[in-house]
From Swiss-Prot:
The modification Phosphoserine is found at residues 24, 47, 51, 81, 88, 734, 916, 967, 1050. It is found in: Cell membrane. ATP binds at residues 697, 699, 707-708, 730, 794-795, 797. K(+) binds at residues 131-132, 216, 429, 432. The keyword Cell membrane applies. This is Solute carrier family 12 member 4.
Amino acid sequence: MPHFTVVPVDGPRRGDYDNLEGLSWVDYGERAELDDSDGHGNHRESSPFLSPLEASRGIDYYDRNLALFEEELDIRPKVSSLLGKLVSYTNLTQGAKEHEEAESGEGTRRRAAEAPSMGTLMGVYLPCLQNIFGVILFLRLTWMVGTAGVLQALLIVLICCCCTLLTAISMSAIATNGVVPAGGSYFMISRSLGPEFGGAVGLCFYLGTTFAAAMYILGAIEILLTYIAPPAAIFYPSGAHDTSNATLNNMRVYGTIFLTFMTLVVFVGVKYVNKFASLFLACVIISILSIYAGGIKSIFDPPVFPVCMLGNRTLSRDQFDICAKTAVVDNETVATQLWSFFCHSPNLTTDSCDPYFMLNNVTEIPGIPGAAAGVLQENLWSAYLEKGDIVEKHGLPSADAPSLKESLPLYVVADIATSFTVLVGIFFPSVTGIMAGSNRSGDLRDAQKSIPVGTILAIITTSLVYFSSVVLFGACIEGVVLRDKYGDGVSRNLVVGTLAWPSPWVIVIGSFFSTCGAGLQSLTGAPRLLQAIAKDNIIPFLRVFGHGKVNGEPTWALLLTALIAELGILIASLDMVAPILSMFFLMCYLFVNLACAVQTLLRTPNWRPRFKYYHWALSFLGMSLCLALMFVSSWYYALVAMLIAGMIYKYIEYQGAEKEWGDGIRGLSLSAARYALLRLEEGPPHTKNWRPQLLVLLKLDEDLHVKYPRLLTFASQLKAGKGLTIVGSVIQGSFLESYGEAQAAEQTIKNMMEIEKVKGFCQVVVASKVREGLAHLIQSCGLGGMRHNSVVLGWPYGWRQSEDPRAWKTFIDTVRCTTAAHLALLVPKNIAFYPSNHERYLEGHIDVWWIVHDGGMLMLLPFLLRQHKVWRKCRMRIFTVAQMDDNSIQMKKDLAVFLYHLRLEAEVEVVEMHNSDISAYTYERTLMMEQRSQMLRQMRLTKTEREREAQLVKDRHSALRLESLYSDEEDESAVGADKIQMTWTRDKYMTETWDPSHAPDNFRELVHIKPDQSNVRRMHTAVKLNEVIVTRSHDARLVLLNMPGPPRNSEGDENYMEFLEVLTEGLERVLLVRGGGREVITIYS
C-alpha cells in the first residue's frame, strides 16, 4: 500500500518509523496470480488501445466508464478501492499501551489493538497539568516570592511561561503537520531535524526526564523528613554547623530507598503507574484549591502562625516554646529557654549573653497577616541573600551589635546564595512538562486537534495559577516567612501549608503524593524514550537498551535510567538538581523551536500544519529565549549541556547515521555546494521532502524566442514551494555548426526567466533529432541530488490541422520517456489563458478531478500553487468518481478524513457515474476519428506516381515551415524514401514496399468502416468524463486532471491525442498530471 495506509491493525510495531512510508507503488492488481484480473475479480484487456486483432478476442473491459485509464489501473488503484483500504488500516501506531498489548499466553496471537480513544481533556490537558505542576510550586515558590519580591517573581514566571508557550506553539505546528505515531516529542524532533540533531536532542530530553525523576524524589524526601516525620532522620547534626551535611546524607539514603522502590514498581508493570495517575492528579488539584481557599479565608480570618523576632532578625521557632526573654512563673520572673540559648545560663545573668540579644527586644509578629493587612507593598521588592545571611524584616527596630557565632543556628539563615539568575534556574522546571500530551500521541483520538488545544490551554491555566499564586503569597504572607525556605520560623511547617485551608496537612500530604506520582511518571517515560532512541539504531552503543521483556517493557533502559537518577539523588539538593534539569529541557525546547523555524523558512511542500497560529519569528524568539535562559540560569551548566549535545551529534555523524526521515535540515543542503551535493547523492528524498523539481521543456520559434512564455510563468507560480527549476530546449542540427545559435537561445531563455522571476538553471542542447535531444535532457539534466523529478511539457497545438505526424509524435514520445524515467509529467493545456504573475484571483476554485491515484501529485500541486499570490484566494475542490458498486456516501466520508490527515483544506464531492449505453454521438465521434486516421494514412500512401512527384517537391519546400523543435523525423519508410534521389526509383520503391490490400482502395470505402470497440469504450470514457467535468468545473480557475497513459504500441498514438482532446474540450485552463510512480505526499510529520 502507499505510505499513508500505514500500520496493519493485526501487528503493530514500534520503532520502525522509517518503514512506515513506501517509496514506490506495488501492483495493486496482483498480476502475478491472475494476469487478466484487475484485483477486484473482474477481467480486463491486457493492453489499452488494442489492435483490431486483439479486439476481436471479445474481452470485455470491466468498467466502461474508466476504459480510458485502463493502463493506470493496471498498476495504480482506483480512488474508491484506495479509500476503502485506507479505512481498514489504523493510522496510528499504539502509544504507551503497546507494551501492555503484548503477546497472549500461547505466544503466537496478539491482542487486537484498540482504536485510540482519548480526547483533549483526558489525553492532553490533565496530563500536562499533572506534569507542569510539581514540587517547585509547593516547596520553592513562596521562597522565590520572598527573595525576589513580587515584581521580579512575576517577571521570572513571565519569562519562563513565555518560553514554554512559544515552544508549545512551535510544537503544535510540528505535531499537526501529519500523524505523530507513538514516540511523541522525540519522534517530532528527530523526524524534523534529522538523525544527528534528533539523537542529540533526544538524549538531552531523556537525561532531562531522568533528572526530573531525581528532583521529584528529592522533593518527596524533603517533605517527608522536614514536615511529615522529622524523627525518621537517620543522620543528625554532630555540631551547630553540621546541619547541612546531615540533611544531605539523609536525602541520599532515603532517596536511594525511594528510587529503588519506584523502579521496582515500574518494573512490575506500568499499568499500576497509569492507574494511580488520576489519584496523584487529584492530590495536585485539591492542594492548589486549598491554597486559594486559604487566601480567601485570610481576608477576614487569617490563620494564627506567630513568628518570633529578635530585633529585626527571625528566630528558628522549633527550638523553644515561649517567644520572650523572661517569663513569670508563680509570681517569679524566670529565664526562658530562649535566654538559656543566648546566655548559656539558666539564670538571669548577663555575663556571657550575646550582645545583640541583650540590646534588642523579642517580639512576635503574625506570619500570615492576611490579604487585607497590606503586606503586599512590603513584599514587592527583592531581598537577595548570601549564604549564611540571617533573614531580617525591614522596618522593625534593631540595635546594631555584634552577634556571637554560636548563636547563628538560633536564627533563620539562608542556605544558598540567591540572585535573579539562580531563581530562574530553580523555577524553570515548574513550567516543564508541556510535552506530556504529545508523548501520548499514539493514544489520542485526534492528535492533530487535541495536542495544540490541550497543551496551550494547560500552559495558560498553569501560568494563571503561577501568576495568581505569586500575588497571593505576596499579599497574604509575611516577608520573613516567605524567605524562610524550610519553615523554621513557623515551627517547621510547610510555608505554603500555613496559608492553606482547612489544614496545612492538606498541602503536605497532597504535595508528597503528587511528587511521588510525578517521579513514577518520569521513571516510566524516560526508559521508553531511551528505548525509542535505541530502536532507531542511530547510536550503536545504545542498541542493547532497545531490548526488554517479552511484553516490550524496556528493562535495560529502566536499569540505566535508575543509575542516572541515582547520580541526581547523590547530589542530594533540590536547588542543585533543578538547574541541571532546566538545561536539558531548555535544550530540547530550543530545538523544537529551531525545527519549526527551519521548516517554515524552507517552505517545504510537506509543511502544512493544521495549526495556523505560528510564525517563524515566534519560533526564533522562543529559541533565543531558551538560549538566553540557559546562560542566565547557569552558564557553566549550559556549556556542559551544549558540549554533551555536540559530542552526541558528532558521534552520530561519525558513525554515519543512514537514516532518512524526511528531515528539514536536508532542505538546507541545496545551498551548501559540494558537501550538500555529496549528502544529497546518498539516496532518493523522503516522501516528506518531495517537492516538484521541474524540468521545463520550452519551444522556440524561428527567431529563437520563447513561443509560450506562460510556461515559465506557471513554473514560477508553482515554485513558490521553492526547490529546483531547470529550463531546457533543443536546437536541431549539428553541434559544431549550431553552437552559437544554442548560446543565443540560452541567453534568450535566461532573459525570459528573469522577467518571469524563475530562479533556476537553463540548458540548451543541440541534437540531430529533436526527440533524442529531449530524451537527453530528461536523462541528464541536474547534478547529484539536484535532479529534476517532474517535467513540464507544452501541448502540441494545431496537431489536428497538420497532415504531418511530426506535429504530435514527439509529444507522445516525450510522454513515454518521462514514464520510463519514473518522472512526473505536467501538461498545461491552453497555456495562453493562464494568469500572469501580475494578475490576482480574488475568488474562484482550483478543481482536482481525482480518478486514479497518482501518488498524491493532484493533491500537492494545488497546495503549492496556492502559496503564490496569484492563486492564494482560490479555494480547492476535489472531485472523485464513484461507480455502480461504490458507496459514494462512505467514499465522501473517507476522502474527507484522508484530506484532514493530509492537512489540506478542500471541498469534497463524489460524482456518481453510472454505467450507461454508448451514445450515438460517441459512436459517431469514434468513427470520425478512425476515418480521419485512415484518410490521412491513405493520403500519404495511395497517390498516383504523378501526384507523388508533385507532393515530393511540395514536401521539400514545406518541411522547413512545418518542422518544429518538438517534431521528429518522419516514419522510417518516409526517411528511406527521401534518400532515393530519382523520382522513378522512389515511386518504384514505394510501390514495392506498400501493399494496397492493407487499406481500402479509395476514400469512398471509408464510410463502411466499423469503429473498433476498444476505441468506442475509450471515447465513451472521454465523452462522459468531459460532460461531468464541464458541468461541475466550467467556472473553475484551473482544472487538474489525471492524464491517461499513452498506448503501449504506436498504432494508437493518433487516437490517444483525440481522446485527450475530447477529455479536455470546453475547459479554459487544464493541467494534465501524470505521476512518476512514487508517493509525493504523506499524512506523517
